């Protein structure tokens, strides 16, 4: 018994040292990858592509009569659960932008589709850079994957919303016990959805095998940070509305940009955690932790910068 107790006491410092080494390596890794710069780049691309993405999504849903009212429900759900405060202003701006896209020609519609593909492509490149993936997917495979996301994604989202609406309309929810469970489920639904989305993102996007447990840990950290930032950002907007005095009617634009930037920063932090968990051999409690990073970073950085230049030009 004393031997067991003593071995536990010896194990605790080792675990603490491993945790400290991991945190130091993670911080060095995030600084090395400049995730704050990459988050700003992705936020910029997202703002250029958010209307095309919503337009493509809603236009695909409109082709199916069963999803007739799903578009408005989807917009309201996203605004109410994933955009903190000022949701009405952002919702009105997006509605106006999307309404104007209905007047576009076929050439304009093609441009919207290309812009949506550009967003997915840049997400793919940034996450693969974090995982130090040197071997790129073949162009045909990448295009097929992006096309599947843009076509099947809206259908799956619409089907889930339609199924939820059908379940809500059932008389089973008249029971007080079931109604309480359903209310609790709705309260946790944004967290569950964001966690599931992060797990899928960290498992499927990198062009290498990612351990499921590592993806779950990174996704849970990202989901918690997302919920905390949502509450903190909403509190800042409501308690310190100085931005309205400066920007006036245009206040929704900087609000949306800052929020999108925070979202991408959280996504990249979760990706860094997931990738670092799979690099245990680099958790060294030395002063120069950055030396333990892979040696192909310079080439990857050049490739990423070259891809960004090509996409922007």
From Swiss-Prot:
Q: Which domain of life is it from?
A: Bacteria
Keywords from UniProt, A to Z, are: Cell inner membrane, Cell membrane, Membrane, Transmembrane, Transmembrane helix
What topology does the record note for this protein and the membrane? Multi-pass membrane protein
**Subcellular localization, as worded in the UniProt entry:** Cell inner membrane
Q: Where is this region: Disordered?
A: 293-313
Q: What are the TM regions of this chain, as residue ranges?
A: 41-61, 104-124, 139-159, 185-205, 215-235, 249-269
Q: Which residues form a coiled coil?
A: none
List compositional bias (Basic and acidic residues) regions by residue number.
Answer: 299-313
Record GO cellular component, one term: plasma membrane
Q: Which family does it belong to?
A: Belongs to the UPF0761 family.
The family database entries (HAMAP family) matched by this protein are listed as:
UPF0761
Name of the featured protein = UPF0761 membrane protein VV0203
Instruction: Record the organism.
Output: Vibrio vulnificus (strain YJ016)
């Amino acid at each position: 018994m004393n031997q067991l107790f003593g071995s536990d006491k010896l194990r605790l410092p080792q675990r603490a040292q491993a945790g400290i080494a991991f945190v130091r390596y993670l911080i060095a890794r995030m600084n090395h990858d400049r995730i704050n710069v990459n988050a700003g780049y992705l936020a910029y691309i997202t703002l250029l592509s958010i209307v095309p993405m919503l337009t493509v999504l809603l236009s695909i849903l409109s082709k199916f009569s069963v999803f007739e009212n799903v578009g408005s429900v989807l917009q309201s759900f996203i605004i109410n659960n994933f955009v903190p405060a000022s949701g009405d202003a952002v919702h009105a701006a997006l509605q106006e932008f999307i309404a104007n896209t209905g007047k576009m020609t076929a050439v304009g519609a093609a441009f919207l589709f290309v812009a949506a593909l550009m967003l997915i492509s840049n997400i793919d490149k940034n996450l693969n850079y974090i995982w130090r993936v040197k071997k790129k997917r073949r162009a045909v495979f990448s295009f097929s994957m992006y096309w599947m996301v843009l076509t099947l994604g809206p259908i799956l989202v619409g089907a889930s919303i339609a199924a939820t609406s059908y379940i809500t309309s059932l008389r089973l929810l008249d029971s007080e016990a079931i109604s309480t469970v359903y209310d609790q489920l709705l309260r946790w639904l944004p967290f569950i959805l964001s966690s599931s989305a992060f797990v899928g993102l960290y498992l499927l996007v990198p062009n290498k095998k990612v351990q499921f447990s590592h993806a779950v840990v990174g996704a849970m950290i990202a989901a918690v940070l997302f919920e905390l930032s949502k509450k903190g950002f909403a509190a800042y907007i409501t308690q310190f509305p100085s931005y309205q005095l400066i920007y006036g009617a245009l206040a929704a634009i900087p609000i949306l940009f800052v929020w999108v930037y925070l979202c991408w920063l959280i996504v990249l932090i979760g990706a860094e955690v997931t990738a670092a968990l799979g690099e245990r051999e680099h958790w060294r409690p030395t002063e120069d932790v950055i030396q333990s990073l892979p040696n192909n970073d310079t080439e990857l950085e050049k490739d990423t910068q070259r891809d960004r230049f090509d996409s922007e030009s």
